[in-house]
Regions:
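Extended, low-polarity transmembrane helix blocks
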Residues: 1-94, 101-167
Length: 167
């Protein structure tokens, strides 16, 4: 009996590392596309205007089961919707584009994890619980893994500057 082990496999488990990298890249591109899609969907709904943003946040304050402290934070955002609305729009678009192209994937995925976690907390009780929890956890997986090293700009950057923790 012979065992064929290619250089791309680990020594003990036989797991193909290239397949794992491809899987992380698919998740990265999917989460990035989700952010870009949501940006354009919300733009079309007028949710990045001060009135649209404040209306949505006030709905979450009234309808969600978020803790009182989080509702106070949401109230602050609603009261400053002229600043918060465009910031949220640019955050969603920036996270999406950076994840799609695979640039600075690890820090961007961590910011996406925090951002999606805050949205999940804001919508708590108003939507299906897994609707945002799955992308939250997927973003955390991208931050821990090296999802940008496949099909992304980070793959090129990691060849030029291998010890950098950003890719």
């Amino acid at each position: 009996m012979t065992t064929n082990v290619s250089p791309a496999q680990t020594g003990t488990t036989g797991t193909n590392l290239l397949d794992a990298a491809n899987g992380l890249a698919v998740v990265r591109v999917t989460i990035g596309a989700m952010f870009v899609w949501v940006f354009f969907e919300n733009l079309g709904k007028g949710l990045y205007s001060p009135g649209g943003y404040a209306g949505l946040i006030n709905y979450y304050i009234k309808a969600s089961h978020s803790p009182a402290a989080w509702k106070a934070v949401m109230g602050l955002a609603a009261n400053h919707a002229a600043v918060a609305a465009p910031m949220q729009g640019m955050t969603e678009l920036s996270l999406g584009v950076l994840l799609l192209i695979g640039l600075l994937t690890r820090p961007v995925a961590f910011v996406a994890f925090l951002f999606l976690g805050s949205l999940w907390m804001s919508e708590l009780g108003t939507a299906w619980i897994w609707e945002l929890l799955v992308p939250v956890l997927a973003s955390l997986g991208l931050a821990v893994g090296r999802a940008g090293r496949k099909w992304g700009v980070d793959a090129w950057l990691s060849q030029r500057w291998p010890p950098a923790p950003w890719w």
